[in-house]
Design a protein with these regions (language model features):
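Active-site-proximal loop/helix segments of hydrolase catalytic cores
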Residues: 1-62
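Binuclear metal-ion centers of metallo-dependent hydrolases, dominated by the metallo-beta-lactamase
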Residues: 54-105
Length: 105
């Protein structure tokens, strides 16, 4: 699975209506794949979203049966990998997330 730009795009600087629409659109698409099995998924994990950096990633991992997840959209900010590893929300799927060192040349 490759999410492309499909993500729960919440932005602190946007108005509430925009973020509500982003929430609606993301959850509508996720409902189409709820519970499906994926061997590998490439998912946005975007530090530019600040506190909401992992909303879409977390939702995907909790609502699908994904064997391995590869973060993308992290703009070479590899610190987001450790941030996710330290995030209590990731505990159920932490071992399935690719490690930052796998990306480095």
């Amino acid at each position: 699975y490759h999410a492309g730009d499909l993500n729960w795009w919440l932005w602190a600087g946007e108005d509430a209506a925009f973020n509500r629409q982003m929430t609606h659109d993301f959850l509508a698409q996720m409902a189409l794949i709820e519970g499906r099995r994926f061997d590998v998924a490439f998912l946005p994990l975007d530090p530019r979203q600040e506190a909401d950096y992992a909303e879409g990633f977390d939702h995907f991992m909790r609502h699908t049966d994904t064997a391995q997840a590869w973060p993308m959209h992290f703009w070479e900010d590899f610190s987001v990998f450790q941030r996710l590893a330290d995030d209590p929300r990731s505990a159920p799927y932490r071992a399935k997330v690719a490690k930052a060192e796998w990306y480095r040349r």
